[in-house]
From Swiss-Prot:
Residues 63-73 have a biased composition (Basic residues). Residues 1-24, 40-78 are annotated as: Disordered. Pfam families: Dus. The keyword Zinc-finger applies. This is tRNA-dihydrouridine(47) synthase [NAD(P)(+)]. Catalyzes the synthesis of dihydrouridine, a modified base found in the D-loop of most tRNAs. Specifically modifies U47 in cytoplasmic tRNAs. Catalyzes the synthesis of dihydrouridine in some mRNAs, thereby affecting their translation. Its EC number is 1.3.1.89, 1.3.1.-. It is an enzyme of class 1 (oxidoreductase). It comes from Scheffersomyces stipitis (strain ATCC 58785 / CBS 6054 / NBRC 10063 / NRRL Y-11545).
Length: 613
């Protein structure tokens, strides 16, 4: 299949299922699987997946400078368990003992290996997933599966160097680790922004306030005689082609590295980092610089998404990423996040109301990002029933060299209470297609990169996906909630049919996520706690999948709310449980028994389902 070729799904031509009368907004469950008809499963606020804990640039947003807690359950405890007796990191590997920076007497961690090993809880059964994957375990003596790679007689760690070399060939490693030196210069404000400095100076000189726009034409005439070219040259960009690409949306918290790696294994072509905030990046915050990291298998096809409200910050971040990372395919500007805190700071969807500022930010990014192309994600508008994306896209195409535009078919105000407007997405797609056609006709611009257009919203099956990509003007579809609730959605797209995964197959997917999570966060007590927490976050979406075999009609709709149901076996029922305590039980199948002090409170509450009329 060529890049621009449209594919058709055989499933689209299949006859409709037998009509079943079901109240609007309700999922049609076969009667024998309904447990309690009058009890409706809780709905969820999926906007939190776009904002999550993000949004506090300075770290001070509440009264008294305290950082506000994001999410609807603001009292949830995010602290992870630490060991009561901690082993000094200099002693993790008995074969490679390092010098402790504090010395045995001053160090807060113990230097008594025997005391530490005696204090550890009983090892989790089985083989350490990290040792199995890469031939050694970086957690060393702290590993919760220590017995699988530790010789008690020699008191040394077991290492499989052959497996280590094989893992490198298999591209099983993480990339985009910004050096301590570069982050140190950022922290001390000593980083040399050779390109961004010129870009910022030039854009500052051209800034006009929106209120003076009426005088812009006259002012432009006066400036024609003194016009000066920009003091920088934009580098030639990598080419992007999103036609028919399987794209996973940027997602905060749940869109972490292990999840993205899982999605690549399940057929995704393009993934994005969690949204990174520009100011914390410039402040060299460790937590923020962890976000652009990726697994090697994500590249090519990996984008870093940033949020900002200032062109100077955008320029600097773009230059840092282009200079300090080697595995980034695109830089994506978030103009769709609806979270109030970001909106009040002028970031995310607030930029939809400030097109002049948005244009400046994109210009700054494009001029400072080296060969990395710049893309943007927007919504239909800020207010409900007032679509502005069409006008905005026309301006972006005319004033910027944007490699791709993604449109989420909802306004900021609308959120997830109604279905995405794919008719409007198609309208905007026509604008982009006409723009590309004009460029093709113009011999001077024929060789320049075409602008890709991607739709986003409510895609939950191969039928939804093909309905979208078979629409003129739409190059591909970005999938968000659909890929969280049903991670194998791209396998359905490739097979062009529904895949009714069994409980065992779904457990295999969770097992893979668990292994990837441990490789990323580590197999010590702290890493296992993080893996468990993020697995619970993942389960807060996957439990919403309703097995096809218990539905009375197809296609399934992502916004439909089911009555309380039971599965075809006990495991399927457990995987569909809305009780977070059951989610913790599921994690224990892969991560061992959780401690009594482990608490997980779901971040998402109600609202994402369309209210029935």
């Amino acid at each position: 299949m060529t890049a621009g070729e449209k594919r058709t799904s055989e499933a689209l031509d299949q006859p409709e299922s037998k009509k079943v009368h079901v109240e609007r907004g309700m999922a049609a469950i076969k009667p024998e699987f309904i447990v309690q008809k009058d009890r409706i499963v809780d709905s969820f606020d999926d906007d939190e997946a776009e904002g999550g804990e993000r949004g506090v640039e300075e770290g001070k947003s509440g009264k008294g400078g305290k950082k506000k807690r994001r999410g609807q359950n603001k009292n949830r405890d995010l602290k992870q368990k630490r060991e009561e007796i901690r082993l000094c990191t200099s002693l993790l590997d008995p074969d490679n003992i390092k010098t402790c920076a504090y010395g045995p007497e001053q160090c807060r961690s113990t230097h008594n290996v025997e005391e530490y090993l005696a204090s550890k809880p009983v090892d989790i059964e089985g083989i350490c997933p990290v040792f199995r994957a890469i031939g050694y375990c970086p957690a060393g003596l702290k590993c919760r599966w220590l017995q699988s790679h530790y010789d008690k007689e020699t008191r040394k760690l077991i290492k499989d160097l052959g497996r280590t070399e094989a893992s490198k060939i298999e591209l099983n490693y993480e990339v985009n680790n910004v050096s301590h030196e570069a982050r140190g210069k950022l922290r001390k404000k000593q980083y040399d922004f050779a390109i961004a400095g010129k870009v910022i100076e030039y854009i500052d000189s051209t800034v006009q306030n929106d209120e003076n726009i009426a005088n812009a034409k006259e002012q432009r005439k006066n400036n024609e005689a003194t016009y000066v070219d920009a003091p920088y040259k934009i580098a030639e960009k990598k080419r992007l082609d999103f036609r028919n690409a399987k794209i996973v949306s940027p997602l905060t918290t749940v869109g972490n590295l292990p999840y993205r790696r899982l999605m690549k294994k399940l057929g995704a072509d393009i993934t994005y980092s969690e949204m990174a905030l520009s100011v914390p990046l410039l402040q060299a915050t460790n937590a923020e610089w962890a976000l652009p990291k990726a697994h090697r298998t994500e590249y090519p096809g990996y984008g870093v998404q940033i949020a900002t409200s200032k062109h100077w910050a955008a320029a600097k971040v773009a230059e840092i990423i282009s200079r300090e990372t080697e595995h980034v395919s695109e830089l994506n500007l978030n103009c769709g996040c609806p979270i109030d805190l970001l909106y009040r700071q002028g970031q995310g969807s607030a930029l939809l109301e400030q097109p002049a500022r948005l244009v400046r930010i994109l210009k700054a990014m494009n001029a400072s990002s080296g060969d990395i192309p710049v893309t943007v994600k927007i919504r239909t508008g800020s207010k409900e029933n007032k679509n502005t994306a069409k006008t905005l896209v026309e301006r972006l195409l005319a004033e910027n060299d944007v490699a791709a535009i993604t449109l989420h078919g909802r306004s900021r105000q609308q959120r997830y209470t109604k279905e995405a407007d794919w008719n409007y997405i198609a309208e905007v797609g026509q604008v982009v297609q006409q723009w590309n056609d004009k460029k093709e006709e113009n011999k001077d611009s024929r060789d320049t990169q075409r602008t890709c257009f991607v739709g986003n919203g409510d895609v939950f099956s191969h039928v939804d996906w093909y309905n979208a990509v078979n629409t003129d003007g739409i190059d591909s579809v970005m999938v968000a909630r659909g890929a969280l609730i049903k991670p194998w959605i791209f396998e359905e797209v490739e097979a062009q049919q529904y895949l009714d995964k069994t409980a065992t197959e779904r457990l295999d997917i969770l097992k893979t996520f668990s292994d990837y999570a441990l490789e990323h966060w580590g197999t010590d007590e702290y890493g296992v706690g993080l893996a468990r927490r993020f697995m619970c976050e993942f389960l807060s979406f996957t439990h919403r999948y309703i097995p096809l075999g218990i539905l009375e009609r197809l296609p399934p709709k992502i916004n439909e709310r089911p009555p309380q149901w039971k599965g075809r076996n006990e495991m399927e029922t457990l995987l569909g449980s809305t009780d977070y305590k059951d989610w913790i039980k599921i994690t224990e199948m892969f991560l061992g028994k959780s401690g009594d002090d482990f608490v997980f409170t779901p971040k998402h509450k109600s609202n994402s389902y369309e209210k029935s009329n």
